[in-house]
Amino acid sequence: MSLLFKKGEIGTIELKNRIVMPPMCMYKSDESAELKTFHKTHYLARAIGGVGFIIVEATAVEPKGRISDADLGLWEDSQIIQHKELNEDIHFFGAKTAIQIAHAGRKSTVKDTTPIAPSVIAFSNEEPFKTPICASLEDIKNIKELFVKTAIRAKKANYDAIELHAAHGYLLCEFLSPLSNTREDIYGGNLENRCRLVLEIVKEIKQKVDLPLIVRISADEWMKDGWNINDSIYLSKELEKLGVDAIHEIGRAHV
């Protein structure tokens, strides 16, 4: 237990202890995608309780990138101020912060929108899921820009680090998986191509945002012919080459 309470580091961040609060969606916002009183109470309570590093829940890079209408967003400059205020409160109690920037892809259930994905393969044929459109090369360029701009906003909001969400079957994870990505261009097919989008986003964020970068990935889909542990090892090595400061790995994806 003594090691748990010793100082730790992630990139240039010094943590007062090694207790980390991972990102967990609370679904307590609304169509505004703003932080509510609930969020401020929720995160501040962890900081007061002594958590050393708090990663704020999945925060969308565009409106249709939310998992639901109750998710957070950071796709506009007007959304920065609330996050800045949250960080000020958390930092007062000595905790460091990161924000998980994300796009739900085909798992988005936002009303009156059509989800986007690497291929026209629905997550489920049941409500509330919809059949996605296939991302064009222009769409992919736009997706990269959305992630980079959101990372820039995160820095302006005084987050100490950024976590890129490439797990749990959401958009970036969908590009990684051969079960959800059946493209025949440079973003599909072999492992190198399927990892391309994640690596391109990481490269641009590292170039434009001077903050430690964490990438969350799924270790294994546990499905025949799906993403597996060897794929994760390959991706992790490529991420390390690009200067990623930490890899946050979870057991499986949900595709």
Q: Predicted regions span which residues?
A:
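Flavin-dependent oxidoreductase catalytic cores
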Residues: 1-254
